[in-house]
């Protein structure tokens, strides 16, 4: 309540949103990158509820004003804020994990970012493909979700350089492009992406 009151009475939320829109030059991709960066910083060291309230009042309005669906905008900033738990320099989850595995916290944080890199891409696809959030018919949602699983698993294989065996550089590039295409909203891109991934697997 205090946070919302301060943001509302001072006009901070409107100013912050206007700042993001003006800096981005009304370019949605740039606005998304700036919003994610802001959400990562604002979410550092905060519990889930507090982080969401803060980013929902400061950063989400900028995306909504640029035509992004309300649910997608809020999920984008919420998801981004939660990723701050593994993002250096704060990375509270990494500090907890470091105490368990007895490793330097920053090393654990960097490895966490490497393993969880796909998670930093997912919020963008919430905006590009709102059906990932269940905004559509059951058939559409199931189909899009299945495609998302294929895309995320493929990206994870690319980042690790391993699928059913060690991947070559060319295989990683082809699978990576295919995985990104699968996550796109256009059906043609999805089909091209699946074809690219299958081509690599068949040629294995």
Residue ranges and their predicted role:
Residues 1-204:
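Alpha-helical transmembrane segments of multi-pass membrane transport proteins
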